[in-house]
């Protein structure tokens, strides 16, 4: 039996071209009888005969498939010729001959090893559903034919051979890492003994050691034991950056591993296969590498083996040779887009080769191999396809992507497959991901409900769902938001209800209760809601039945202890001044929040004119651009990200130093989540609020809800630099307004002209936005813009923070002293604020009372 190799991941054909394929003939051509009456008209006189072929295979890269033996023979002949030439050349140096012989011997050894290697690699099928199959060249003594013939022999080029050897010795380029805004982690080999009492699976412990998580956080320590051991529903509330993702990811992974362990089929003893080939449910919890993909108790769908019985065209009885060749026609088929699976035919007896290089099997070896294949097929067919076992729902797309990356990192050595379903991305690609039958799906409610309504097979039966997670649940169940979530929860609790399903609900503001608006409190029969009422309402909306375990680790203030809060009172027009001053005085990774997209766009244009070059993130952006901006913001050390509340919840961006509230949030929950983007994982951070006259009401509500004991300190601002900042902001506003007005006018006028051309009508000047300007007016406007930009460019070229030296005496050169740049990088915003606090806390020294009898003149 001889099995050919094909590429595991063939390149897709380019658009507009056809991929070359060949036909592997397995059976024989049959003559088709034709009715003689069809030849009466004389239109088919040129037809000689008509034959059909029913037993064949479509193969890719046929020249490589059928000419491998010839290439091996040519290589062997070339090696022997080179050896003869080397023996005949006695005048060459001995050292060169020795090195060349060693190199040729190594090549010959590699060629022999490649011939003796007996390994099956399943190639990835095309989207059209064609199967790449490998079979023997001889079937029933008939030699197979192909449309693609072997390439003709060519003379060897020594220069090309040298180039090939150089390419083989050159180091390979490193693989591109996955795009993510999270910090890259290498193998930390941390001590995970603190996790052992929390019933964490061994495979997860290995991943935690790899990630460097030596000890659990408080929310993890209190959640894992009741969730894994007692299988209780959890309502968890903890501060931002406290590790809530792992608190629900580890119980979900444990639940999936337990399902695989229960569903694993028993190991048959009659197979005679090596123990290494039959690693099943007994090693599901040992945490072997994920490349074997067998720790979860069953081999993956990618390694599923299917056989097809080949029909015999002739009536000749099967000989041992034909039976061996028939067994060689067993197909190893992969699921669509599933990649390579583990080879199930490793360490088998190598078939003997005759002088012509053709492989022959004994009848005994063929029988053993066929029996082993049949046993494996029986095992795989006993196990059903993997259902959906874990579902995670998140409010934003970026948070869903981040949760998926966290789960993949923890499930690194478990072999569990995950998929993500979010809007803004290709629906067809996500459907193909679901076709792989992942055990865990992370999704936003909109796209998930869309695929559920389309009745995707993997989402059609949710009764086997073992774990449901709702992250940021207080936002998800708010009235007027996520209408698809209510329909999804209703389906899960009614027609797709599973009584053994575990529900985990987490949020940083799960138990925070803010005061309702006055218009609602003035109504009749309105009861003030407390923490218990809020949790009961949440349990009712989610559909929790029974009494869950409530874990509340939040403080009354809502924010973490390592967060420093400060504020600046200013007019609305002065917010741009203080924002630009802060960004220039204290550089670093700063995240600026606003309440509206229009404000984000205006700030972006203003800061770009001032050469700050910020990044933006809001709901009207394309999803790929949103992810690209997040990755760039996490990569750069000195960068500004302007974002709406899309980026307020859950995002774990490393080393964010400052969070600036350009507009005060409307609720205290949003303020807590915004401020939680910094000061994560016991690190320090700064939260700055720019409070205008219209923000005072919202600020007082937040201050009252969070029960602040002391007033939020004012941020120190050096007023001596504000005059230069005001001049820069004035020029930048004029330029930004003029450019925005010109852009809107051009956009409107171009649309009007296109519509008029389509309707074949003439336009009047009043229909143009701002009137149809003549050339003289346009030149005057451009000249004015050029002057403003030159003036601003001159101001930007001057240092903003400088100290003017004052002296009472003339200098030696007779010129005024040069200004000295202020050392703005020495002191950070946190150190400046702490220094101001220390000054305020210093007690004033009491003045000594005047002594009696002393007089003042």
Curated annotation (Swiss-Prot):
Residues 576-723 form the Helicase C-terminal domain. A motif (DEAD box) lies at residues 471-474. The modification Phosphoserine is found at residues 80, 92, 170, 288, 296. Residues 152-161, 835-844 have a biased composition (Basic residues). Residues 290-307, 345-363 have a biased composition (Basic and acidic residues). ATP binds at residues 238-245. Residues 848-857 have a biased composition (Pro residues). Pfam families: DEAD, Helicase_C. PROSITE patterns: DEAD_ATP_HELICASE, HELICASE_ATP_BIND_1, HELICASE_CTER, Q_MOTIF. Belongs to the DEAD box helicase family. DDX24/MAK5 subfamily. This is ATP-dependent RNA helicase DDX24. The lineage of its organism: Eukaryota, Metazoa, Chordata, Craniata, Vertebrata.
């Amino acid at each position: 039996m001889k099995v050919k190799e094909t590429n595991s991941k063939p390149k897709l054909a380019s658009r507009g071209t056809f991929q070359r394929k060949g036909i592997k003939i397995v059976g024989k051509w049959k003559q088709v009888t034709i009715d003689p009456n069809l030849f009466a008209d004389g239109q088919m006189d040129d037809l000689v005969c008509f034959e059909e072929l029913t037993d064949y295979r479509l193969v890719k890269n046929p020249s490589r498939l059928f000419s491998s033996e010839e290439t091996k023979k040519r290589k062997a002949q070339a090696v022997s010729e080179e050896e003869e030439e080397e023996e005949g050349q006695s005048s060459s140096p001995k050292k060169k001959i020795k090195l060349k012989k060693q190199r040729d011997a190594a090549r010959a050894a590699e060629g022999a090893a490649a011939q003796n290697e007996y390994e099956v690699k399943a190639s990835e099928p095309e989207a059209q559903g064609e199967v790449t199959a490998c079979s023997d060249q001889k079937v029933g003594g008939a030699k197979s034919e192909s449309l693609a013939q072997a390439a003709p022999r060519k003379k060897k080029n020594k220069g090309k051979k040298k180039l090939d050897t150089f390419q083989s010795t050159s180091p390979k380029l490193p693989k591109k890492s996955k795009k993510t805004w999270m910090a890259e982690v290498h193998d930390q080999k941390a001590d995970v003994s603190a996790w052992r009492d929390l019933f964490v699976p061994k495979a997860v412990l290995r991943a935690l050691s790899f990630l460097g998580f030596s000890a659990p956080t408080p929310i993890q320590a209190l959640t894992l034991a009741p969730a894994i051991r007692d299988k209780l529903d959890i309502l968890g509330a903890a501060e931002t950056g406290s590790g809530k993702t792992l608190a629900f990811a580890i119980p979900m992974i444990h639940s999936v591993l337990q399902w695989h362990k229960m569903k694993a089929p028993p190991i048959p003893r009659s197979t005679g296969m090596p123990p290494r080939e039959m690693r099943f449910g007994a090693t599901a919890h040992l945490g072997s590498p994920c490349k074997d993909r067998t720790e979860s108790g069953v081999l993956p769908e990618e390694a599923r083996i299917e056989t097809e019985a080949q029909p015999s065209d002739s009536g000749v009885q099967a000989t041992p040779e034909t039976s061996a060749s028939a067994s060689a026609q067993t197909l190893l088929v992969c699921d669509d887009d599933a990649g390579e699976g583990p080879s199930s035919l490793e360490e088998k007896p190598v078939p003997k080769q005759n002088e012509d290089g053709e492989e022959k099997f004994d009848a005994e070896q063929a029988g053993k191999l066929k029996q082993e294949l049949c046993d494996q097929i029986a095992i795989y067919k006993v196990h059903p396809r993997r259902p959906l076992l874990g579902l995670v729902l998140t409010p934003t797309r970026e948070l869903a992507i981040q949760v998926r990356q966290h789960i993949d990192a923890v499930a690194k050595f478990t072999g569990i497959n995950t998929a993500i379903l979010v809007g803004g991305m290709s629906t067809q690609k996500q459907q193909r991901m679901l076709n792989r039958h992942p055990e865990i799906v992370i999704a936003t409610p909109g796209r998930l409900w869309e695929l559920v309504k389309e009745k995707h097979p993997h989402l059609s039966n949710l009764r086997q769902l073992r774990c449901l997670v709702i992250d940021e649940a207080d936002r998800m169940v708010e009235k007027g938001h996520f209408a698809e979530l209510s329909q999804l929860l209703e389906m899960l609790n009614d027609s797709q209800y599973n009584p053994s399903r575990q529900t985990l609900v987490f949020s940083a503001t799960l138990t925070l209760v803010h005061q309702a608006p006055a218009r609602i409190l003035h109504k009749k029969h309105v009861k003030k809601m407390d923490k218990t009422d809020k949790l009961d309402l949440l349990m009712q909306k989610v559909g929790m039945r029974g009494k869950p375990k409530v874990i509340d680790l939040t403080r009354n203030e809502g924010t973490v202890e390592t967060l420093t809060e400060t504020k600046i009172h200013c007019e609305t027009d002065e917010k741009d001044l203080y924002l630009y001053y802060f960004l220039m005085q204290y550089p670093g990774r700063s995240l600026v929040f606003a309440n509206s997209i229009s404000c984000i766009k205006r700030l972006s244009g203003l800061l770009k004119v001032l050469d700050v070059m910020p990044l933006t993130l809001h709901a009207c952006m394309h999803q790929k651009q949103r992810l690209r901006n997040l990755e760039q913001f996490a990569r750069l050390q000195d960068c500004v990200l302007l974002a709406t509340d899309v980026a307020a919840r859950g995002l774990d961006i490393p080393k964010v130093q400052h969070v600036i509230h350009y507009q005060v949030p409307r609720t205290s929950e949003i303020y807590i989540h915004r401020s939680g983007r910094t000061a994560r994982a016991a690190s320090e951070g700064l939260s700055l609020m720019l409070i205008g006259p219209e923000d005072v009401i919202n600020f007082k509500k937040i201050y009252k809800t969070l029960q602040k004991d002391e007033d939020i300190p004012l941020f120190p601002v050096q007023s001596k630099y504000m005059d230069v900042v005001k001049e820069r902001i004035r020029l930048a506003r004029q330029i930004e307004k003029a450019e925005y007005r010109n852009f809107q006018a051009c956009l409107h006028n171009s649309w009007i002209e296109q519509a008029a051309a389509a309707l074949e009508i003439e336009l009047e000047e009043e229909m143009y936005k701002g009137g149809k300007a003549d050339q003289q007016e346009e030149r005057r406007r451009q000249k004015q813009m050029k002057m403003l930009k030159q003036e601003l460019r001159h101001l930007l070229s001057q240092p903003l923070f400088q100290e003017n030296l004052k002296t009472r005496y003339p200098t030696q050169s007779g010129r005024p002293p040069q200004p000295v740049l202020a050392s703005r990088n020495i002191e950070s915003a946190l150190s400046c604020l702490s220094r101001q606090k220390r000054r305020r806390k210093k007690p004033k020294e009491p003045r000594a009372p005047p002594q009696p009898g002393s007089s003042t003149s």
